[in-house]
Amino acid sequence: MTKDSPNKAHPNLALLAKLDLRDLDGSAALFSDDFVWHYFNPKLPDVAGDYVGIEGLKRFFSIIGAKTKGTFRVEPVSATPAGDELVVVHARDTLDIGGQAITLDVVVVWRFVEGKIKEAWDIPSAFTLAR
């Protein structure tokens, strides 16, 4: 997201800006107790599913980290609020799986309820993996 974006003052963007995916324990207060991370990727069916709570989210990133041997990186590109509950984030992920360097676009739709992150849908461009 650019610094001059008119959406910068949106409260959900401010909340999302506090999220540190490298320190989920430190960011735990941002999440509702029943938070759910939804992940679907036909290229990684063994990872697909719902991950519940902060522990579930930590497990998801642990699995991705192991599959990529620690090469997984997320570079946010833009964030756009949609109404009162949703923020759509476009990110570019880089990783290495089986010796293949991969860059892919991802959309994560974050849902906020009562000032907490309630749900997120991680939608990778699974069919453009071979670049």
Model-derived segments and spans:
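Short, low-complexity N-terminal intrinsically disordered segments enriched in polar/charged residues
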Residues: 1-33, 131
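A general structural-boundary detector
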Residues: 2, 14, 44-47, 97
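A beta-strand edge to alpha-helix "cap/lid" segment located at domain peripheries
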Residues: 2-4, 58, 62-131
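Short charge-dense sequence patches
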Residues: 6-18, 38-41, 57-61, 116
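A short, structure-level motif marking secondary-structure boundaries and short turns
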Residues: 8-9, 46, 92
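A solvent-exposed, acidic/Ser-Thr-rich amphipathic alpha-helical stretch
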Residues: 26, 32-83
